[in-house]
């Protein structure tokens, strides 16, 4: 019985420490991804994305809706390339706004990882098709 309890404690501590890729509420609330829908123009949207990169919390913005769930494959992508998917749900900024933000993040991924991430990324992210055409 004692061995079982020790095993359970060790298991829970390993699982809780394995969640490296989660953000605090403060990081989420202060992120550019959270503020992008209120940005005043393309340059401010790009600036918010660059700030998220500098703060080591780059996001890829997803159009909302039920079909935009973040899958296990997406979570593996997040871990591997050190980014976060941001799903607004049903009320999201325009696809144009998301595309402008995402273009900055795509360029960051390209500069840091080359083309390796392109094969693994989900293809429905706003702005991805345009980015892929130009690279």
Model-predicted regions and their roles:
Residues 1-23:
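Bacterial Sec-dependent N-terminal signal peptides
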């Amino acid at each position: 019985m004692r061995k079982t309890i020790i095993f359970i404690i060790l298991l829970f501590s390993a699982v809780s420490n394995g969640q490296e890729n989660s953000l605090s509420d403060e990081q989420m609330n202060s992120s550019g991804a959270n503020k992008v829908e209120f940005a005043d123009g393309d340059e401010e949207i790009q600036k918010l994305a660059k700030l998220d990169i500098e703060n080591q919390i780059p996001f890829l913005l997803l159009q909302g809706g039920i079909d935009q769930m973040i899958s296990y494959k997406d979570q593996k992508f997040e871990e591997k390339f050190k980014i976060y998917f941001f799903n607004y749900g049903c009320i999201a900024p325009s696809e144009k706004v998301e595309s402008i933000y995402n273009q900055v993040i795509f360029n960051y991924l390209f500069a840091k990882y080359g083309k390796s991430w392109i094969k693994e990324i989900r293809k429905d992210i706003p702005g991805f098709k345009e980015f892929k055409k130009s690279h």
